[in-house]
Amino acid sequence: MIIFIYINMEQSQVQFSFYITYVLLMTTATVTFIEAMRTNIPNVRHIFNLETCISIIAGYFYSIFVAKINAEGSKVNWNEISQLRYIDWSITTPLMLLALCLVLANNIKEAVHLGTMAAIILLNYFMLFVGYLGETSAMSRWMSEFLGFGAFAGMFYLIYNRYVKKSIGIDNTVLFTMYFTVWSLYGGAYLLEEQNKNIMFNVLDMFAKCMIGLGLWVYYTKIVKID
């Protein structure tokens, strides 16, 4: 009886993390969409358009996750949900990287070049590919982790070398560090058991997609003054 209650409580925590992430994604999409319509600065509008797309796409997949959880009840296949995330990530992560590069490039008055962006996205897809192989047991999880972090390091090195190293001030360094930290934590969560992994992925999605999107809104609208 005690074990049954514990399992139900643990599952309720996972379900709640899905619900709250979905709500925050829809909130972020609303805020960034309104700001994209309001601003008259083209580069900022492009960034908010991307952030809106990211939140809507991720929100759509979270609606699928929530529907599966509600339909399956106590027999949720968490591993299947973990695998479905890769479809979400294959669409949203390139958009997130493009948005990051646009913000960083805009701050140093440069353009985002196709060659650099293509290399970053190819490394991103390689990282996702080996992650999926580990998720489906087609590759050992530790080998997948090692190869994935190699691609991750190469990807963020390109971003740093192109857009952060030459920047003046701390804006680009702070944003780059936030992205680097949150994205690297996905690699740690990847090694957890399924329920804890899904909770961590949900929390990290909240930061990577919601908090970053809302943070950019605060940054560009200057609604919070730093004395």
Report the location of each language-model feature.
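Hydrophobic alpha-helical signal peptides and transmembrane signal-/tail-anchor segments
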Residues: M1-I5
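Polytopic alpha-helical membrane-helix bundles and their juxtamembrane interface segments
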Residues: I7-I87, T93-D227
